[in-house]
Amino acid sequence: LSIRYNTILVAVDGSDEAKRAFRKAALMAKDHEAKLLLTHIVDTRTFASVEHYDRTIFSEAEQYAKDMLNEYKGLAEKEGVTDVTLVLDYGSPKVKIAKDVAKKHNVDLIVTGATGLNAVERFLIGSVSEHITRHAACDVLIVRTETEQPGAGNDA
């Protein structure tokens, strides 16, 4: 019994966790001959606190996102992924990824990094990966960092 994925979504934000998730998603897309959906959500909540909504800051964030997506697209193509789609959207990343982007593009696997929140942050806001796992209608793969491996560094 083998499971084949047709459309794999990975969200990138410049973090190490996202890079690790991207690498795993690219390898899986190549192995499954699947479409790779690279997405970045510009978190509009971070702009809500900026006085008078500074348009230049927003434009810079948008340009940064476009450049980053194109850079990741190049890396994916170098890895041998032939079908890469870029999605730039706006809003709350955890809501947009799980509900809007995944549904709109018929995603059957979301690959996400295990976000590095401390216990207090996790309690207060919950991690993006946790929200996606709870609310996505498709499979979710959470890619752990080396330091988060169960039992890592516990050579007793």
Locate the predicted segments by residue:
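Short, solvent-exposed amphipathic alpha-helices that sit
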Residues: 24, 60-72, 96
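Gly/Ser-rich helix-loop-strand patches that form or flank binding pockets
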Residues: 4, 27, 103-151
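Small/aliphatic-rich secondary-structure junction motif
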Residues: 2-55, 79
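Structural beta-alpha unit
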Residues: 1-3, 74-110, 147-156
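General small-molecule cofactor/ligand-binding pocket signal
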Residues: 39, 85-89, 141
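Short, well-ordered secondary-structure micro-motifs
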Residues: 21, 48-51, 96-99, 122-124, ...
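Acidic, proline/glycine-rich short linear motifs
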Residues: 40-67, 150-156
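Residue-level marker for beta-strand->alpha-helix junctions and adjacent short loops that shape enzyme
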Residues: 15, 43, 91, 117, ...
